[in-house]
């Protein structure tokens, strides 16, 4: 079987077709940004008659097999590419292989499209993030018909998980390999991340149902979400430790401190008081606030490895993105920006010394993790692309509601050619003003330090003064 090969896209074409950031105070981040797109473009694959994958789709950069949770995270930055990196066909590769009972495998073979793992194996599932990935892409293209088309697959998959991965206490189980954190030192019966991810799944499904006008679906999934939220907080939250823990078969806490509990911020299951306790762990230099944040295992855990050893302390793009999006969800925007700046600086240092972007990184020095694959975009494009647009420049697009939220940073930044209603959107800020170009009127929600503004922006170019 011929090995998969990517397509070639000329760098000048990339710059013409993709969003172009303006980061005058951090030109090295711009270099990293474009390097990520160049590597990502090489991961656009062509399916074969033997595997029946899509004619073109973006791949996980891991040897040809397609991986469920990699693909879902890749959606978070590929969505800005106007399908230059074809993310929707990549997701369709999984839906097209769904079993009649709703099951979708975590990995399918390049050679023949077959499931790599036995269906009954605990390793055969991955975090249930398809609905979340579809919702992220929907925020850019605003195409409700796409959500309508994939709803049956998403709904069937959710219910397969409830029948096959839900425990008697209402929580969910997985294995280390199935969790995506392959060698994480956890052996619980109920896993906090998998349970919280299923809550996020239910929350997102309720939002998709609302878009589709499915009132019964909204009610079903909202009830699922609230029930699971209650069980997670009742059984997994430890008030003294300020942490969610995995549970053993007797519902006793298994206290291995990983990044898994921080999914709770993104899934909106926490109270403000819980947020502060979780933030304290992220801020703690003995745990997660290292030279390069955030290691996937706390640095004061006995299993922590300074060289990373995969999920025993390495810094990984998907979990960093999850944490950063969670920080924005609870309004911790300044901390998110500081964390992303550290993440990007570390990636730049390693790019300068090695010429490429890596699968994972060490938390305590500017180096790739051991082991780690080079040229990994793949999901390592999350920092240079998605976090630059969403955290450093500060932009969240909501095309369905014709609304842009801009968390304006103190320094001058900008971006042009964001995908927006079939055209381009440009946003630039200086110390004194904001400049916007849009092909149609939009609502702009500005968060500028303590100031909150909602502006109705007309089509074309407009300049407004920053609040003081």
Task: Go through each PLM region and give its residues.
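Non-catalytic C-terminal accessory modules of carbohydrate-active enzymes
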Residues: 283-288, 325, 329-468
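Short, contiguous, pocket-lining structural segments
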Residues: 186-200, 217-220, 224, 256, ...
């Amino acid at each position: 079987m011929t090995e998969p090969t990517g397509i070639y896209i000329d760098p000048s074409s990339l710059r013409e077709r993709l969003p172009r950031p303006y980061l005058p105070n951090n030109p090295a981040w711009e270099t990293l940004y474009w390097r990520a797109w160049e590597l990502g473009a090489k991961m656009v694959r062509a399916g074969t008659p033997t595997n029946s994958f899509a004619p073109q789709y973006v791949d996980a950069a891991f040897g040809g097999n397609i991986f469920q949770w990699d693909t879902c995270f890749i959606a978070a930055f590929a969505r800005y590419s106007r399908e230059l990196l074809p993310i929707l066909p990549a997701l369709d590769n999984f839906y097209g292989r769904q079993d009649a009972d709703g099951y979708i495998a975590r990995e399918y073979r390049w050679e023949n499209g077959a499931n790599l793992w036995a269906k009954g194996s605990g390793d055969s599932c991955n975090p249930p993030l398809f609905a979340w990935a579809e919702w992220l892409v929907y925020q850019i293209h605003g195409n409700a018909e796409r959500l309508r088309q994939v709803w049956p697959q998403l709904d069937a998959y959710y219910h397969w998980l409830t029948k096959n991965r839900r425990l008697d206490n209402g929580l969910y189980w997985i294995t280390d390999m199935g969790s995506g954190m392959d060698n994480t030192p956890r052996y619980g019966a109920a896993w906090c991340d998998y349970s919280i991810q299923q809550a996020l799944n239910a929350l997102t499904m309720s939002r998709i149902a609302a878009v589709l006008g499915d009132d019964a679906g909204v009610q079903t999934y909202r009830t699922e979400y609230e029930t699971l939220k209650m069980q997670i907080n009742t059984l997994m939250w430890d008030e003294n430790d300020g942490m969610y823990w995995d549970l053993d078969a007797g519902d006793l806490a298994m206290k291995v401190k990983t990044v898994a509990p921080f999914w709770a911020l993104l899934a909106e299951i926490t109270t403000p008081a819980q947020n502060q306790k979780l933030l304290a762990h992220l801020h703690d230099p003995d745990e997660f606030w290292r030279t390069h944040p955030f290691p996937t295992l706390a640095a004061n855990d006995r299993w922590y490895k300074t060289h990373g050893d995969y999920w025993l302390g390495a810094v990984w793009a998907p979990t960093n993105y999850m944490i950063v999006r969670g920080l924005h969800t609870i309004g911790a925007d300044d901390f998110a920006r500081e964390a992303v700046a550290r993440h990007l600086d570390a990636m730049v240092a390693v790019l300068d010394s090695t010429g490429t972007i890596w699968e994972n990184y060490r938390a305590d020095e500017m180096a790739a993790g051991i082991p780690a694959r080079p040229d990994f975009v793949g999901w390592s494009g999350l920092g240079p692309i998605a976090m630059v647009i969403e955290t450093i420049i500060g932009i969240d697009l909501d095309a369905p509601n014709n609304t842009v939220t801009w968390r304006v940073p103190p320094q001058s930044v900008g971006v042009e050619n964001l995908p927006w209603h079939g055209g381009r959107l440009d946003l630039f800020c200086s110390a004194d003003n904001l400049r916007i170009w849009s092909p149609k009127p939009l609502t702009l929600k500005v968060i500028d330090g303590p100031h909150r503004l909602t502006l109705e922006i007309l089509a074309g170019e407009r300049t407004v003064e920053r609040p003081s």
